[in-house]
Amino acid sequence: MADFTLSKSLFSGKYRNASSTPGNIAYALFVLFCFWAGAQLLNLLVHAPGVYERLMQVQETGRPRVEIGLGVGTIFGLIPFLVGCLIFAVVALWLHWRHRRQ
């Protein structure tokens, strides 16, 4: 398993041992391989004739077709993401303030 550690612990004030360079290189190569494989799959999907259209076909004709507009996508996609980021930022600021106060 790759050794990927931070130089300083998040919760205690103690410093951790330095991480190994070969472990970090192996982890970086694994991530690059995953991105490469994903890019190859997307490239295959986009350039293969008719594959994308076949995957997107709905086989059940009894189900109603639902199209999501920009407003609905914004309300149910972007707004929850921004609220989650705001909650994460508030927790991070609170932890930072608490750490500086000690």
From Swiss-Prot:
<feature type="topological domain" description="Periplasmic">
    <location>
        <begin position="46"/>
        <end position="74"/>
    </location>
</feature>
<keyword id="KW-1133">Transmembrane helix</keyword>
<feature type="topological domain" description="Cytoplasmic">
    <location>
        <begin position="1"/>
        <end position="24"/>
    </location>
</feature>
<dbReference type="GO" id="GO:0005886">
    <property type="term" value="C:plasma membrane"/>
</dbReference>
<keyword id="KW-0812">Transmembrane</keyword>
<feature type="transmembrane region" description="Helical">
    <location>
        <begin position="25"/>
        <end position="45"/>
    </location>
</feature>
<feature type="transmembrane region" description="Helical">
    <location>
        <begin position="75"/>
        <end position="95"/>
    </location>
</feature>
<keyword id="KW-1003">Cell membrane</keyword>
<keyword id="KW-0472">Membrane</keyword>
<dbReference type="Pfam" id="PF10954">
    <property type="entry name" value="DUF2755"/>
</dbReference>
<protein>
    <recommendedName>
        <fullName>Inner membrane protein YaiY</fullName>
    </recommendedName>
</protein>
<keyword id="KW-0997">Cell inner membrane</keyword>
<feature type="topological domain" description="Cytoplasmic">
    <location>
        <begin position="96"/>
        <end position="102"/>
    </location>
</feature>
<dbReference type="InterPro" id="IPR020513">
    <property type="entry name" value="Uncharacterised_IM_YaiY"/>
</dbReference>
